[in-house]
Amino acid sequence: MLVRPQEPYPQSEPPAAVGRMVQIPYVTVPLYAALLIALGWFGGEQWRNKPEPQPMRQSVAHAALVPLNQPAVKAAVAPVNAGPEIQAEPEIAIDEDNLPPLRYSAHVYASLADKRSIVLNGQSWKEGDSPLANLVIEHIQQDLTVFSFNGKTFTLAALDDWPGGAIEESPQAE
């Protein structure tokens, strides 16, 4: 038996990928060029020198932390003439029946009583603390705080400031 060697593929047409370059259609060349330029442009943003951050100015929120019952801080000015001595303003007197104004700036409620806190007049307080004479924080609830002032219980909604004045008995007070 005679065996004739067979050719692996017909020789009429050579394969397209062997020894030839792949040509890109002329329409897509500008598109590829634009994509490469954009990649270099936006990729270079990561390595450019960033400008130095500017110093932060005092925020408006800082003014909210100043207690309402303290007198305003005035800048020291050297006296020009030695005139009569100026009397200092007396400190705000706390009346036993009137509660002074309270600035309520933060309210944190948690399921654990140790984690609950509020910020009154710029200071943090927990349940059982006494921010002012005769004022006790009884309970910090989810949407309000229960206070006791001179034995009278009253509530204050979370983040509502107390304008000052007498505590009156009301149905909401308990």
Swiss-Prot record:
It holds the Pfam family T2SSB. The keyword Transmembrane applies. GO terms for cellular component: membrane; type II protein secretion system complex. Keywords: Membrane, Transmembrane, Transmembrane helix, Transport. InterPro entries: GspB_C. It is found in: Membrane. It is a single-pass membrane protein. The chain crosses the membrane at residues 24-44. The keyword Transmembrane applies. It comes from the Bacteria. NCBIfam families: T2SS_GspB. Belongs to the ExeB/OutB/PulB family. This is General secretion pathway protein B. It comes from Klebsiella pneumoniae. The gene is pulB.
